[in-house]
Amino acid sequence: MFKTIKCNQINDKLINQKIEINAWVKKIRHHGKVTFINLRDRYDEAQVLVNDEKLLKITSQIKMEYCIKVQGKLELRPSNLVNKEMRTGAFEILAENINIISRCNELPFMIEDNNNANENAKLEYRYLDLRREEQKQKIILRSKVTHTIRNYLTKKDFLELETPTFVKSTPEGARDFLVPSRIHKGHFYALPQSPQIYKQLTMIAGLDKYFQIARCYRDEDSRGDRQPEFTQLDIEMSFIKKENIFKLMENLIFTIFKNTLNISLPKKFKRMTYKHAMNTYGSDKPDTRYELLIQDMGKYFKQSSFNVFKDILQNKGTIKALIIKNQAHNFSRSKINNLEEHAKIYKTSGLYFAKIENNEFVGGIAKFLNKIKQTLFQTYSLKNNDIIFFIADSWETACKAMGQIRIKIANELNLTNKNTFEFLWIYDFPLFEYDEDTKNYKAAHHMFSLPQQKYIDTLESNPSKVLGEVYDLVLNGMELGSGSIRVHTRELQQRIFNIVGFKDTIAEERFGFFLKALEYGAPIHGGIAIGIDRLLMIMTHSSSIKDVILFPKNSFAASPLDKAPSKVPNEQLRELNLTIEDYKN
């Protein structure tokens, strides 16, 4: 009688016992009258020794990635043949029976880490790519993370509830994926971009602690690392302040990292206002794993002879500077030219520089710095081999452009510690931003966020100055999640709709069902949504979220595996009252 086990169950207690393993052939080596087979399953690897003449005939047919069943006796290997790179390297199975469960065609790429296969091949044969150890472990970690989330939140009295995936189309920035209704001719469902409205309705229902590991859908233009469908942890709570969300998420993420990676994070994350983040890091999602802080030098250049900077200051602009200590030798003229071109992408008027040699400014705009030389040297402790970069522009443009220069320089100088996880809360965001193209205000995050109390009475007088009860969670320079305390009265929600250009009739048409619900005793409530895919990408040091999604789409929102999206027969279209026009016209 053979005991069926997995590869990871091999141990000393099974020596000389008869075992059975069902697994895949990772490697097979023929040595005359002996064949060695390395088996792999989800759990581990094991070596099989075949020396029986009848079985050798079977092994002569076996190739890599065949799925086979092996029965045999577990033995210790000779001490000089122990493979210390395998956990089971001290054991081998002396084969008594071998059955080929199924054969494997010629492989499109080798099933090994760092196999250099192109992305489309890996996606087309995703079921093979998932056999690679590195890739497999990422998907297993995903399961562990979602399991930890469910356990933690359930113990905190949260209800895991499922909101609809066929919803009314209420575009929130990106385009909706639309699903035509066969029953309701000419009408369409949308796939949700987020469960936002429904989780708020859940709070109005009195179900005060909700979470969902939610599938979300956005029909966005193709761009490197976007996926048309993605997963987020969605949380909403009643009768709370943002502090409650901060504490909950800090404890949850601490538990996730401890349980899955055995990493102890700080129990309290850093906090920073939006204004400070922009001024100091040039980003509302700053990477704080390295210092390289942006300086505001506007007040010094009021005395400068450099008219370009003086004119910008007179027009209420700003001068942002980045000081790179003891690295001037690493910035050749060609490298500086590249940085100047990079700055132009962000619509700034230019990137300027000056190096320090022999206790003097040299190169770039050095000749315009003589009047303020001593002030800058003393204020910033400047020394030889330092280099300063300057951007002069409107506040927002200068901050964002210098923030991108900061990131590029940090990458080029390898300043980032890849093995650390720096979490950060950003809060006090503007509630609205002005769109120069439409000449209208739009929600900076979304339309359901509560303005801070001091702005509510004067909301319409200067929307660009209004701050919201809005917060983002940032990890290693990436936005991991976003949340807010929500509007909970119809009157205030209607005012916000009006500010962003939704007149009463449009608001009623799109959101009437939600506005009506706000008239039935809505509680104070708020929440957050965390990108599961992005969290896992960072946890696994992956370069793409595709690596942590079981069956992802490619960069063009298509699936090489099943060839989705695909055309459908005309009879299906007729049932839906649809016709396809020639897209070329």
From Swiss-Prot:
It catalyses: tRNA(Asx) + L-aspartate + ATP = L-aspartyl-tRNA(Asx) + AMP + diphosphate. Its EC number is 6.1.1.23. Residues 196-199 are annotated as: Aspartate. Belongs to the class-II aminoacyl-tRNA synthetase family. Type 1 subfamily. GO terms for biological process: aspartyl-tRNA aminoacylation. It is found in: Cytoplasm. Transmembrane segments: none annotated. The keyword Aminoacyl-tRNA synthetase applies. The record marks H31 as: Important for tRNA non-discrimination. Keywords: Aminoacyl-tRNA synthetase, ATP-binding, Cytoplasm, Ligase, Nucleotide-binding, Protein biosynthesis. GO terms for cellular component: cytoplasm. The keyword rRNA processing does not apply. Homodimer. SUPFAM superfamilies: Class II aaRS and biotin synthetases (SSF55681), GAD domain-like (SSF55261), Nucleic acid-binding proteins (SSF50249). InterPro entries: Aa-tRNA-synt_II, aa-tRNA-synth_II, aa-tRNA-synth_II/BPL/LPL, Asp-tRNA-ligase_1, Asp-tRNA-ligase_1_N, Asp/Asn-tRNA-synth_IIb, AspRS_core, GAD-like_sf. This is Aspartate--tRNA(Asp/Asn) ligase. ATP binds at R218, D219, E220, Q227, E479, G531, I532, D533, R534. One of its GO terms (molecular function) is aspartate-tRNA(Asn) ligase activity. L-aspartate binds at E172, R218, H445, R486. HAMAP family: Asp_tRNA_synth_type1. Aspartyl-tRNA synthetase with relaxed tRNA specificity since it is able to aspartylate not only its cognate tRNA(Asp) but also tRNA(Asn). Reaction proceeds in two steps: L-aspartate is first activated by ATP to form Asp-AMP and then transferred to the acceptor end of tRNA(Asp/Asn). It is an enzyme of class 6 (ligase). It comes from Borrelia turicatae (strain 91E135).
